[in-house]
Regions:
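Extracytoplasmic
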Residues: 51, 100-105, 115, 129, ...
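Membrane-proximal extracellular/periplasmic loop immediately following the first transmembrane helix
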Residues: 45-94, 104-106, 210-214
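The feature marks short, hydrophobic/small-residue-biased sequence motifs that occur predominantly
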Residues: 75, 80-127, 177-180
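Short, solvent-exposed hinge/capping segments at secondary-structure junctions
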Residues: 110-118, 134-148, 183-188
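Solvent-exposed, non-transmembrane alpha-helical starts
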Residues: 65-69, 104, 117, 128, ...
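N-terminal Sec/SRP start-transfer signal
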Residues: 1-30, 40
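Mechanotransmission and gating elements of multispan inner-membrane complexes involved in transport
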Residues: 164-223
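Mid-to-C-terminal secondary-structure elements
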Residues: 137-177
């Protein structure tokens, strides 16, 4: 011990550099851990809010939400304590008149009276054609407000913001909630009757009593 202390006294610069390197490595690990956790949260906060017990996808989707395609007949075939239809699609929007300021988003098509409907921190739930509720990051980072209109890239559809929710991110993109009917127009460029609408998943709370053979069970840890 005496020799070690004596060596450190005579080589202060060398040991200071060693301590500095160890500190920088520890800081880098801390920084990367925080970054990874933040990205993981932004990848699925909207999903966590569902508090779902099961997410049913098509059996050919390989567990991927955006690759799943279901019909309303599939939805009706599921017998469960509580269920909700979900349609999802990534997209790009921009404020009307500001096409150069494009924003990556994730569209969620839902029914406003089902449990997938988001909590509101401002405004109201959508109820008319073209109305949407969006994550509040679009207000904080992009300056959007209730009443603003959004254009959808690749579509003639115009969306009107009527409410804001919080902690609604999916695949590191803010979520825009809309009716299933509006979603069909954006996704398929046509209005579809209720019975012909396409969805990506059936989200279940509680016990699932009956599931068709073409559906695949995903646990609540779905990412």
């Amino acid at each position: 011990m005496f020799l070690a202390i004596n060596e450190m006294k005579h080589s202060k610069l060398r040991y200071a550099l060693v301590i500095g390197v160890v500190f920088l490595i520890a800081y880098l690990v801390f920084f990367l851990t925080g970054l990874a956790y933040g990205l993981a949260q932004e990848n699925r906060t909207a999903v966590d809010k569902w508090q779902a017990d099961r997410i049913l996808l098509s059996d050919e989707a390989n567990g991927k939400l955006n690759m799943s395609m279901l019909t309303m007949d599939d939805y009706e075939s599921v017998k469960a304590e509580d269920k909700a239809a979900l349609a999802q699609f990534p997209g790009i929007v921009y404020q009307k008149g500001k096409k150069n300021q494009q924003i990556d988003v994730s569209f969620f098509g839902i029914e406003a009276d089902e449990f997938l409907a988001p909590n509101l921190v401002k405004g109201r739930m959508f109820k008319n054609t073209g109305e949407v509720v969006v994550n509040d990051s679009l207000a904080k980072e992009d300056g959007l407000q209730v009443g603003d209109q959004l254009k959808v890239a690749g579509s003639k559809q115009t969306l009107k913001i009527v409410g804001f929710t919080d902690e609604a991110m999916y695949n590191v993109a803010p979520v825009i909630y809309m009716s299933l009917a509006d979603f069909q127009e954006i996704r398929f460029n046509q209005a579809l009757p209720k019975e012909a609408q396409k969805i990506n998943a059936i989200v279940v709370r509680g016990q699932t009593k009956q599931v068709a053979d073409n559906l695949e069970n995903q646990p609540d840890s779905y990412k």
